[in-house]
Regions:
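Anionic-ligand binding region
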Residues: 16-49, 68
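Short, conserved loop/helix-junction motifs that constitute active-site signature segments
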Residues: 48-52, 76
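Short glycine-rich anion-binding loops that position phosphate/pyrophosphate groups of nucleotides
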Residues: 11-19, 61-64, 87-90
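Short, small-residue-biased leader/transition segments that mark boundaries at the very start
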Residues: 1-7
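Short beta-strand/loop segments at the ligand-binding rim of alpha/beta enzyme cores
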Residues: 52-58
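Small-residue (G/A/S/T)-rich helix-start motifs and N-terminal tracts that mark the onset
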Residues: 5, 79, 86, 91-131
């Protein structure tokens, strides 16, 4: 039986965070307020750069050009697989117990039907272990 190290990054980490954080409540003033944002560290990209034989699986949440954007992410972040979610599909993404995903590797695209998130997790593991 073959052993494999893998990393599955399934958190929707924010791409940006506030540059300045107030220590106390910000009082209402006349006019509008702007909040300056800074980019957060790209955890998945860092893992891909440091990869040493591990299988790296990331997630992609898209509202347009899902397959194209997810393939770019696969390559740019040096992942072995991206689990792509189209947030515009009914029953997919956040806020429910179901999801509809496409498993994307360099050579494959496997569209999974709508199923529970637990079932999706099992399919992801089965797919990875079959590699």
């Amino acid at each position: 039986r073959r052993q494999r190290q893998m990393c599955i990054r399934d958190r929707a980490v924010a791409d940006y965070r506030p540059l300045h954080v107030a220590d106390e409540k910000v009082k209402k003033q006349d006019g509008n307020m702007s909040i300056e944002l800074e980019r957060t560290d790209d955890i998945l990209k860092t893992l891909g750069e440091r990869k040493n034989g591990q299988f790296i699986c990331g997630f992609s949440m898209e509202t347009e050009n899902m397959l194209e954007n997810s393939r770019k992410k696969l390559e740019k972040k040096n992942c072995d697989m991206i689990v792509a979610n189209n947030l515009k599909q009914d029953g997919a993404g956040f806020g429910g117990n179901t999801n509809i995903v496409t498993l994307i590797t360099k050579d494959d695209e496997v569209q999974l039907e709508k199923m529970t998130k637990d079932e999706v997790a099992e399919k992801i593991f089965d797919f990875i272990l079959s590699r």
